[in-house]
Amino acid sequence: ARAGNLIFLDADTLVPPSTFAQAVEALNGGEVGCGGAQLVLDAYPSRWFAGQFLPGAWNWISRKFKLFAGSFIFCRAELFFDCGGFPETHFAGEEIVLSRKLKKVSRKNGKKVMMISHPPVISSARKLDWYSDLAILRLVIPLLGMPFFLRNQKACRFWYDRPTKD
């Protein structure tokens, strides 16, 4: 990449024009080195655990610790390359590792870290069609308690495999 700015976006994420503009303006302004945005799901607000609690908890964590959801990350290209980019050792959660590395290199270079709160990006809830709240909970708890599982492809099947119907 030869551009001065990089934006990483999931193919199934919708970015409101003003969110995109905030990211580009922040990077072009020179004070911000990297950032992300809060998110909402495009469906299933009635599912309390997976449709409301998990996205809300993620938004709180991402605001508090400035960790970026993989659905929308923006940064200065030189900072991305300086920090080594995405880790190739992780099958999931690589955006968390990248967030931490980008924050560190941004601050080292005197740049701010930005979290866009409004409007949030709209992320796909399609996995809620595939998994029940209980199934999601059974997949998430081991990953939270043992993050080394993020380096195990089988443990990260939730992000890659569509379950088969019996």
PLM region spans:
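A recurrent flexible, glycine/aromatic-enriched loop bordering the glycosyltransferase active site
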Residues: 39-46, 56-75
